[in-house]
Amino acid sequence: MQQFELTHEFLSQLEELIDAGNKTEVSKQIAGLHPADIAEILEELNNERAQFVFLSLDNEKAGDVLAEIDEEERVHFIESFPAETIARRFIDNMDSDDAADLVASMPNEQQHEVLSHMEDLEQAGDIVDLLHYDEDTAGGLMAKELVMVNENWTVLTCLREVSRQAENLDEIYNIYVVDDDNKLKGRLSLKKIITAPTSAKISNLYYPDIISVKTDEPAESVALIMQKYDLVAIPVIDQVGRLVGRITIDDVVDFIREEADKDYQMMSGISQDVESSDSIWAQTKARLPWLIIALFGGMVSAWMISRYEAEIALFPVTAMFIPVITAMGGNVGIQSSAIVVKGLASNSLSLKHGFQNIVKEIGGALINATICSSIIFLLTLCFGMQTLAMPITVTLSLFVVILFASIFGTAFPLLLNRMKIDPALATGPFITLTNDIIGLNIYLITGRLILTGLG
């Protein structure tokens, strides 16, 4: 299958066919396209045209396409469909994890109505079961579809069961072996059962060493485990060890992307998860808290400057370097905190090595502070200062501010992480605001001491 590229010409041609009501030609245009490509097309169409395309798909492909549509768009898209259509045309043909995510996005009343119209009662039961788990746990990520065989079966029985169970799966990553109580015992490869005698017992063939996670395992931990052991799928067990589902790499990738989006927004000073398609009020609510905090922080900085009004009036050139000091402090702090937050998120930085990281950061900060301070010293000399008081003030202040910002930007995320608070809060507006206030204090106090003494 060739990679599809959505062009303006293709979209215009498709819209003309839709407006003409030519369902046959529309079906030909999208035939053979991957569900993700069709989802991309639907997101570019208005709701009426998207529905026309969607209803031209067969039930199985419609379910696959719906799973690929962005969550926010998907919620708006299905609002116009009756509960019976959602249940029988879409949810009955989706994987249990995708179906559960879709149902979870509906109001409670609509959830009950949709589930009551489902023809696949086993699928309905799986969805209800999955809805009980927190979305940020292994239980919330897992799907119920898997291939499971009993350790007491023969290879012949196993082959028959694998063939039957595989009908509900797109890919078979592993065959899981359980005992009579459905407790996970190990895994079995397809090669093993194909090459083994049909009369052989599964108990003599399976691999007992298998990595699994419990339903309440945090999703972030699941992602780290799968990354560490290079897994494409991992079984999920309940508290007593019974096999209840499996998580595949695509589910983990989706979770990682969502978490990265949240962290990026938090680092940008957006307190809630918002999309460009959200209402103006929703976007305002997400941005306003940090803007108000930044406003009050700016007022604190203004008040601090007013306290040194006499010194600034006596040495007006002092005001010229305030933006340099605050900008450098903010930039250095963000750089340091971003490195720490990245390390904590990828589990490559532990609290045990936190002190070592601070020491390393101090070393780097000393080098950066020395270089930047030397540059600013030479630049201030170019302004033709009559004395060395101002160059020394700016140079010394910048050196101390860079050193402090580096240490603070490194230590604060580690402290938040130890307090079980998302360290992403430590980056962006908070670091900038804190370093602005403290950096100004350092600069103005240094100026008062040096300028009044040497000026």
Q: Can you annotate each of these PLM segments?
A:
Residues 1-270:
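Hydrophobic packing positions in regular secondary-structure scaffolds
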Residues 262-425, 429-433, 442-455:
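Alpha-helical transmembrane segments and their membrane-interface boundaries
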Residues 437-438:
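Active-site His/Glu-centered metal-binding helix of metallohydrolases
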